[in-house]
Amino acid sequence: MDSWTFCCVSLCILVAKHTDAGVIQSPRHEVTEMGQEVTLRCKPISGHNSLFWYRQTMMRGLELLIYFNNNVPIDDSGMPEDRFSAKMPNASFSTLKIQPSEPRDSAVYFCASSL
């Protein structure tokens, strides 16, 4: 086996706890083997109808991946390739999936919500 087989992808997630921000994201940290599926979850602030998924890397800075309004994707132009997908089946829950994960996916991922 080559060294890539054992390469791990580190995905750090910025999580807002039960504070004024109110957005809940899980898991807090995710480390996975290359090729595995990663699912990030976000619960927006109750009553907010817009949800945003972001990715931040040292090389590219902050990037908007996808934006939902009333559970409908409005702008997904930042979603890289076909390995990334996001859903918002209802107003209280969204997921961001990466499958299969690759080393270049290492970043800080976070979501935000607004009225």
From Swiss-Prot:
Q: Which cysteines are disulphide-bonded?
A: C42-C111
Q: What does this protein do?
A: V region of the variable domain of T cell receptor (TR) beta chain that participates in the antigen recognition. Alpha-beta T cell receptors are antigen specific receptors which are essential to the immune response and are present on the cell surface of T lymphocytes. Recognize peptide-major histocompatibility (MH) (pMH) complexes that are displayed by antigen presenting cells (APC), a prerequisite for efficient T cell adaptive immunity against pathogens.
Q: Which UniProt keywords apply?
A: Adaptive immunity, Cell membrane, Disulfide bond, Glycoprotein, Immunity, Immunoglobulin domain, Membrane, Receptor, Signal, T cell receptor
Q: Where is the signal peptide?
A: 1-21
How it assembles, according to the record, is:
Alpha-beta TR is a heterodimer composed of an alpha and beta chain; disulfide-linked. The alpha-beta TR is associated with the transmembrane signaling CD3 coreceptor proteins to form the TR-CD3 (TcR or TCR). The assembly of alpha-beta TR heterodimers with CD3 occurs in the endoplasmic reticulum where a single alpha-beta TR heterodimer associates with one CD3D-CD3E heterodimer, one CD3G-CD3E heterodimer and one CD247 homodimer forming a stable octameric structure. CD3D-CD3E and CD3G-CD3E heterodimers preferentially associate with TR alpha and TR beta chains, respectively.
The keyword Ion transport is assigned to this record = no
Q: Which Gene3D superfamilies match?
A: Immunoglobulins
Give the highest taxon in the source lineage. Answer: Eukaryota
User: Which species is the source of this protein?
Assistant: Homo sapiens (Human)
Q: Which GO terms describe its biological process?
A: adaptive immune response; cell surface receptor signaling pathway; immune response
The cross-references to PROSITE patterns, in alphabetical order and at most eight, read:
IG_LIKE (PS50835)
Its recorded name reads T cell receptor beta variable 12-3
Pull one GO CC term from this UniProt entry: plasma membrane
Q: Which residues are glycosylated?
A: N90
Entry's Gene Ontology molecular function annotations: MHC protein binding; peptide antigen binding
Every copy of the Ig-like domain together lies at: 22-115
Q: Where in the cell is it found?
A: Cell membrane
Q: Which Pfam families does the record associate with it? A: V-set
